[in-house]
Amino acid sequence: MSDLHFSYQVTNQKLQAIIKQVKTLAPDYILMPGDLIDTLDMVDKNSERQRLLNFLKKLGQQATVILSVGNHDMYRKPTEGQTGWQYEVASKLFDEIRALDNVFLLDNQVYEDENIYCLGYTQSPKYYRADKGIVEDMPVLLSELESLPEKYLTHLPEKKLKFALIHSPVYLNQPEVKYLLREFDYFISGHMHNGVMPPVLDELINSSRGLISPTKKWAPENSRNTLRTYADKLLVVGALTTFHECIKPFNKLNAFFPSYMALMEFTTKKTYSRKPYIKHIYKNW
């Protein structure tokens, strides 16, 4: 699950409903590829910060939680004389999250146990072209991936499932990117909010395109990819909060866009491929 965009509009009722749904699904791992918070402003108050940490703590009691970093997790609404991108401030929140039991926040880091290997790569503000709004930059993506420690990308454990959590999927199907990530089984992303595609159309239209992207591009690709072919590695997860606090008054439309989760089920039987069964869950909370 992805893109919670934690803010005042994400009520305790919604958080409890998410925890209840996770308990029903009973996963071994919860993978969250970024945008846990809407902006850093939303966790300035200690009460709100603790509300978020308590939610993650409860998730960690259900399954191993692995998070990566999204663009909203590093951003604060700009004030006079200050930039909106405040990575150092975000790092303090990341450390508080890492202090929770069974919760692992990966900021260009790796999680590994007896079953899985998981990279959490952070696309930096430079990738998002912070000085020009959200304009994603593929050369920066390639440069940042190449600058990661070689051991993060190559000679990976063959018998373990290998995941790369990368918030934005925009360029993840490009040949150059796929080559750098060739040893991974799956890329898990969010960011696109299912291309703001209503659930009924999401189920009926067999395409990776959505209606609109965060950069306001129409019919964007890689908006809602669901591993339709054996060669496909990219799973783009829809949002827990489609219209977030930052884009008032559109957040009133959340009533028509249920929260989304994707459950990946893997078989222990020998098969042609490790391609998992994907179950889509839509809930209005």
Predicted regions and their residues:
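Acidic/histidine-rich helix-loop elements
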Residues: 1-15, 37-48, 75-87, 127-139, ...
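Conserved beta-sheet core of the metallophosphoesterase superfamily
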Residues: 169-262
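Solvent-exposed loop/turn segments at secondary-structure junctions
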Residues: 6, 36-39, 71-75, 111, ...
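Active-site neighborhood of phospho(di)ester-bond hydrolases with catalytic His/Asp-centered motifs
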Residues: 1-2, 30-35, 64-71, 104-108, ...
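Binuclear metal-dependent hydrolase catalytic cores centered on His/Asp/Glu-rich metal-binding motifs
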Residues: 79-80, 87-91, 101-102, 114-166, ...
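Short, electropositive alpha-helical surface patch
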Residues: 57, 84-101, 120, 124-126, ...
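Short, well-ordered beta-strand micro-motif
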Residues: 112, 120, 226-228, 263-265
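Membrane-embedded segments
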Residues: 1-104
